[in-house]
């Protein structure tokens, strides 16, 4: 009513908008009105005095979506502040907060970059690193694999090795683990496989299937060696990719209280 909206929110949207402050997971598909619901949620929190606009952070996957979300929130807050029917004991304070502060909307990658530029030296990570895209990563990985002199434990084309290298490296960033951690787990798996009881009449130490598993373990170790070389080369060139940037930013927020507080 105070926003002059043409359509009222659905019961499901209203439940999200007016839910108690705190963590909330909402699952919604395309066309469900996510942007409008998020904007209304922010207005509800501000109007009820739970937050001021400058304590609101909205993160999305694309720049366009971030711009749309920010614009939508600002428009709705402006309507609320300009409406003379918005009154109450804290209305003037809330209205002043809307006029003098602003929400922050950004993409996940951009926000991670902001954290890294501000606090990267705590890791330490070079705060002026150049962000490279998938094509540049693939090119660097291709050069590295071409220079690899060791025979791979599994039969793979060089393009497949490049793909495997980048895929494993991305998964490591997503799970915030380093090569030593993965190598330890891989070694543990190999030892468990080797320690499995053998068939009573087995003609060889390992069956073909078991040998295939062990070859994959060895291949994974080789990929980890490549990843270590790849990351060293990236550091020397002052490069970071989006996955690393996100992992470093998350690590900063988790391990340094001043980052989370800011």
Can you name each region flagged by the protein language model?
Residues 1-27, 32, 36-37, 55-57, ...:
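Accessory N-terminal region flanking or inserted into the helicase ATPase core
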Residues 44, 75, 79, 143-150, ...:
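A generic structural signal for well-ordered alpha-helical segments enriched in polar/charged residues
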Residues 60, 81-207, 221-228, 237-240:
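Conserved ATP-dependent motor core of P-loop NTPases, especially the RecA-like helicase ATPase domain
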Residues 1-124, 261:
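P-loop NTPase Walker
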